[in-house]
Structure formats: C-alpha cells, structure tokens
Amino acid sequence: MAEEKTIEWLKEGEFGVSLMVDQTLIPYEYKKIKIKTSDEMFNAIKTMIVRGAPAIGIAGAHGAALAAIELKGEDDFINKLYKKMDYINSSRPTAVNLSWAIKEQKEIVEKNKEKTKKEIIEALIQNAIKLENEDIEINKKIGDFGAELVPKNAGILTHCNAGALATVGYGTALGVIRSAFKKDKNIMVYADETRPRQQGARITTYELVRDGIPTTLITDGMCSYFMKKGMINFVVTGADRIAANGDTANKIGTSTIAIAAKYYGIPFYIAAPKSTIDMKIKTGDDIVIELRDEDEVKIINGKPICADGVKVINPSFDVTDHSLIKGIITEYGVFKPEELKENFS
C-alpha cells in the first residue's frame, strides 16, 4: 500500500470531491469514502476519519476547495471563504500541517482574487493536487535519508502511525522503515499499540503486514523491557508540530519512549517534512495540546473498562524535549534540533 494515495482529489461532476480512506474502520475494513462539503471535511478531521499530520494538511487543502465550491453562488465570496477555511483549521489544533495547508490555499486565493470564482476554485483544486503529489515525493526522500541511519539487523520501535495512511502515501517514520526494508537491512519493527485510539495496533501493523515487513506488536508499557534486552536499538516516530528549538509534539506516549531510549543509549529520531516545522513556535511550551473526549479512554468496543465516576484526562499529544532527539529526518536531510533555526528560518 506504500504506492497508493490514501487521500486524493477525485474528479467528479463539475469540480470534484475529496476521496479518502476511512481510518476508523481499519483493520477490519479498507474503505474509501467521498467527502463532498467543508462541514463533512471538518467532521472527518475532528473524528479522525483522516488522521496523521501530513494527511490532515491535504484534507485541509481539499476542504478549502470544497468550501469555495459551496460558496460559488454567494456574494462576498472571498471573506466567506476565509471564514470557512478558518473553521476547518480549528478542527484539530496541534498538527501544524493543517494550518500550513490552509495558509497555502489562502495564498492561492490572494493571487487569483481578481479572477472569476470558477477560476479561483480551479486554482485551489490544482494546488491541492500539487500538494498531494509533492507529499509522496517528500516522504520517499525522508525514507531514503532515514534508511541510511538504520543499522543492519535493527530492532526498530515506532509509535502511533506515521505511515502511508498518515500521509498521502509511503509515510514519514514508516517511510524510513520501508526504505530500510528495501535496502535489505534485515529489520524487525516493534509497533506499540498506542492507547487510547490504538493507531499502532490498528493501523501501523496493518500497513507493515500488508507490505511484508516483519512486525511485532507490543503494548505501550513494554518498550523499556525490549530496550534493556537489546531487542530495540533504533527508534523513529513522526511528528505533529516541531518547534524552532526542536521540541516535538507527537502522539501521547512519545516523550515516554524518548526518555527510555535516552537512558539505554538508543538513538531516537523524528521523521517529518519541512511543513511540520513551525519556526514561529520557539519551544514546545508554546504548542497547543489537544484534549480529546474521555470516552476514548473509558470505553473500548462500546463497553466501559473502568468504574463509573472515575475522572479521565485525555491529552492527544505530548512534547518530546529536543535534548532527547538525536536527529530530525526531513526531505532536505537529517538535522540536529539545534540546526533547525539555521536551516529552516
């Protein structure tokens, strides 16, 4: 599945719709659904039908085009369009790729604002398609740079899902793993389940098994056990937002893994495109962390797993301190956290 698009613009009718994999159904069903309105896109992002920072960015670009299509008969077209874009941008606050894509689409509108509404719509669609295609190429570059870091016979731990389904295709952290596998590095991947939404168990194992990459599923609390035994000697995860100093927001539990890796002397890498680096954010303290519904923790398969009345706090992300990160793998190469300002300002 590394080579197919998991989210793409589909030409249908006058302008088209967004076509994406419904990730809430995996691993039980691989199904693509059509998103036809900006409200549907907001809901798809919010409810994690589409998830993964790069994929959310493309979804935002598609949502902007859908909003323009909806408003083509309205007066005050551009102001109303910007309001809808801002609404889509509010669906998930932590992943910077969403706001990056909305900003890209607003720039397209500004460049074409003297043209007809139809021309603006077409420009937004074409830019969204361009971003789709660029994402796959970016991920393959990340994969190739990262694969050079992976030792032979490596036991690689990854957290959550930063694969084809978290992007348009190929993946960031899983892109590194895919490229290492192609280079016959004889790897074993350890995917932790990633509570509470189980993206590692549901989605990462689904991707890797489909691609024939040796994979072992472990629970979130097991990483130190396998590190101490020498079975894990390399860690790579994706990212949702990287601050200027290298502090990195990623799925809750990432920081715990990084601390354990540091203790055992295991290199911990982040794999992410330039669009995930937010130079306006100085440190991780300034990153907004999304809090999600407590039922994600309390209920599994429709059944409660805890006592009634217990309190739950459910942050979706944590911030890994830059001092724990060996390097950040981008489409431009691998950088130490302290090198970001010089190379991406």
Per-region residue spans from a language model:
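Small-aliphatic-rich amphipathic alpha-helix that forms the alpha element of a beta-alpha
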Residues: 43-50, 56, 256-259
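Acidic-glycine-rich active-site phosphate/pyrophosphate-binding loop
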Residues: 29-40, 152, 229-237
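Conserved phosphate- and dinucleotide-binding cores of soluble alpha/beta proteins
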Residues: 187, 193-345
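N-terminal active-site beta-alpha-beta segment that forms phosphate/nucleotide-binding
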Residues: 49-218
